[in-house]
Amino acid sequence: VLALAGDDPSSKSSTITSGCEYAFMDLEIPMLDPADVAEVLEYGLKGIALSRYAGTWVGMKCVADTMDATMTVMLDPALYATREPQGMPSPPDGVHIRATDPPMVQEERLRHVKLPRANAFARTNGIDRMVLDSPDARFGIAVRGKAFTVLRQALAEAGISEDFARAQGLRIWKVGLAWPLDADAARAFAEGLEEILVIEDRRSFLEWQLRDALFHMDRRPRITGKRDEAGRPLLSDLNELDSAQILRALFARLPQAFRTNAMLARMSALESLAAGDQLPVHGRDPYFCPGCPHNTSTRVPEGSRALAGIGCHYLARFMNRDTDFFCQMGGEGSAWIGQEHFTSQEHIFANMGDGTYAHSGSLSVRFAVASKANITFKILVNSAVAMTGGQTPEGEIDVPHIAAQLHGEGVGRIEIVSDDPDRHRGNPLIPSTVGFHHRARLDAVQKELRAVKGVTAFVRIAAIVPAHPIAWRWNRLKRRSAASAALINLPAIRIFPVWRVFVPPSSA
């Protein structure tokens, strides 16, 4: 089994930063950390082979720069071929789990057989690599994952070529199996070094493993990374590293001989940029794209309040729309179930995207029905995962299916609001009790729904489904073909925003 873990270490499209390293370690799952698209392919195939050989799950860290990227790759069968290590002990009945397996026997097999086999497999198949070595190395860099490509960029900006680095005694060890660290390989890497700089994104993970592996060496090098030997901050432990941060660390830790003219010039440029960062800037709150249906769908009637959700409609929190609070994706509206008992407010709206509804949000609707909550879910259908690339939502659940499912879950009243109310009218999947409205009636429909106390004895829920694709998706479809444009049914009258920029008169 190869388990892919999607991480967002800089919180670019998530509400919090994330890293899978400690989760995999706590589950005692060996973890691979690819640096680029090519290694995603290599580690993916080798990870599956590793899982078979060691009899354990194998995890792989995935970030946007490795999974949402393109790269020209030479497909070399020899690179993906694997060999089984020789001389590794194996239980007579194999390494895999079996029926009636006592817990302590499983624990012993995992700790004493499977994890050592994972290290041996990685060693035999070149997952950890000495990418640069020197016969008289004194300074070492241990790096893992995407940070390796950023390190290469920083070295290039500093004018440090491989030949120059080798001549000055630099050794670079790229760790592919981030956990468990191969202690024997770590000690071989550290032999003869005076200092090791550990480079990794976000939290320290490789650094402390390296310290553990080298602790009993007679002559062990200094290890710096997130902090230097005096405890001063060196590399950020908060998010992804960029080439500027790594270059500053290299400048601070590398021997004097590495300070090339290019490095000095780049450091001077970085200092100038840092000075510019101190200048005041005018803040600009994010806003919806021109023409986006969320611009109207996220409005609530006067006197009402809404709960934000995960997606583009989250931006409503920054606007004057009485929309606050947010939760995990799929939990939209669920906070109200506990909150409503401690407030004089009788009703609330909750925004939820169609993609979220399809994979997990429907459970919040079910929870609200079971809790007899007084809430209106606004299912915002735009047929795209707009914040992270515009992909089609998994499952591609459409408006008729959403309406039918809401009805089946026990939602008391359902209204569909769109530019073309007749588009879905008469669809056999849509219950006969569902109403159809033009978007001009959005405010009126919301006022009606907030007054609904429950159609049955226990249901107090309503749902609005604005069937309206996002603005840029309209334009994309229109460009692709006239037939697609006809399906969109754009209005004849269009509104274009005019940006007025004040230019002060010249003093000349």
Where are these regions (language model features)?
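A glycine-rich helix N-cap at a beta->alpha junction
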Residues: 1-4, 82-95, 372-380, 399-416
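Short, charged/polar "capping" segments at the starts of alpha-helices
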Residues: 11-13, 148-151, 205-207, 386-387, ...
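Flexible, low-complexity linker and terminal segments
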Residues: 34-288, 293, 310, 429, ...
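Short, structured coil segments at secondary-structure junctions
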Residues: 27, 168, 192, 217-219, ...
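Thiamine diphosphate
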Residues: 1-52, 63, 295-298, 305-387, ...
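C-terminal helical cap/extension that packs against the catalytic core
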Residues: 413-433
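Residue-level recognition of beta-strand->loop/alpha-helix junctions
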Residues: 174-176, 379, 418
